Amino acid sequence: MKGLVKVNLGCGPKGKDDWVNVDYGILALLAKYPFLKKIAMRIGILPKRYTKWEWPKNLVIHDCRKKLPFKDNQMDYVYTSHLIEHFSKYEAINMLNECFRILKPGGYIRVIVPDLELLARKYVECDHNFFLANTDKRHAKDIVLADLFNMWFYTEKNREPISSFYGSLYHKFTRGHKWLYDFESLSLMLKDCGFIDIKRRKYREGNVPDLEFLDHFQETSLYVEAMKPTHTNPKLLESFLR
């Protein structure tokens, strides 16, 4: 694996130092600039639980909804976990197109999102315990099943008003879920971007390296990998055959 160029988009505090780690938002900025973190803690914007997180030292601050700061055909692997569900669908498609651009022919992408099919099935089955086990315990007490289900789609501030000024400021810089995917919908998006060999994978299993460190959220996630073709881009070939 020596010499491979690997990028983790939306790395959060789980980045690995031999990857290019990219993230954006207030938490990433505070991790990148410790003096801002101290100020945020002092005025109460940053919850104490976030102070224990160790972000990667080589963190790149970049909004992945915009053009990625990498050259064409530069990356061997792209990994992105629990990121695109925070984007509008068209923004997620734009990012996946960018991933296709920066991957080398034969390179792999691994996309991990909350599994919409699983969540829907657990709701229909009235599996209250599943949602309680996979919901922030601070917000799960005495909440009915429908509310637990809705919390996968909407932000906390949609459920109840944020009482403090600093709490409101914090929520302005955080993003709830905007669009969820099942295997069929995510596969179609990847296919439309030009990817082939699209497969559903298991937790910490696949072609992308370092999954034993990178993969998390086993109970609720959909894991999908796809490859950039080594031959002519199928989208361009199709346009010539029309």
Regions found by a protein language model. Name each.
Residues 90-98, 104, 108-242:
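S-adenosyl-L-methionine-dependent methyltransferase catalytic module, highlighting the catalytic core
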